Amino acid sequence: MTLAEEFRSRNFSIYGQWTGVLCIILCIALGIANIFTIHVLRIVFSVLCLVSGLVLIFIEVPWLLRICPTSSKFDAFIRRFTTNYMRAVMYAIMSTIQWLSLLPGSGASSLIVAAVFLLIAGLFYALAGLKNQEFVGSKTLGGQGLVQMIV
């Protein structure tokens, strides 16, 4: 299945996964960009955004668990997020954390962009769950075809 066919399938988990890839890029970039500030609270939220981006890499690109040396506890933690609802909850939590970066003392920052896109990805996964769509991983990002080729 090509990338265009995946998008035409109208499976919201595919949309969620690709929005998640965008979230990875945004979380890592914005986490690094906002860490250089004098506001201590913003530094904390920047680190949380950076950690979120790194966790999302392993969740959204499954073949990385096979090629990167990680602990069995970390692998078990990542494998919890295989359903649409679990991913929706995870994205909602990550988004809420970034929305909290607007608290007084931290000031408004570009971390809000990460919060918005994390929320959108969570909504895609929630819609997939509500429509009873099975979680389908993109073949481009390491769906069943690529994982079987690596093994």
UniProtKB/Swiss-Prot annotation:
GO terms for cellular component: Golgi membrane. Glycans are attached at residue 11. It is found in: Golgi apparatus membrane. SMART domains: Cg6151-P. It is a multi-pass membrane protein. This is Golgi apparatus membrane protein tvp18. InterPro entries: TVP18/Ca-channel_flower. Pfam families: Cg6151-P. The chain crosses the membrane at residues 21-41, 43-63, 88-108, 110-130. GO terms for biological process: vesicle-mediated transport. Its main location: Golgi. Golgi membrane protein involved in vesicular trafficking. The lineage of its organism: Eukaryota, Fungi, Dikarya, Ascomycota, Pezizomycotina. It comes from Aspergillus clavatus (strain ATCC 1007 / CBS 513.65 / DSM 816 / NCTC 3887 / NRRL 1 / QM 1276 / 107). Keywords: Glycoprotein, Golgi apparatus, Membrane, Transmembrane, Transmembrane helix. It comes from the Eukaryota. Belongs to the TVP18 family. The gene is tvp18.
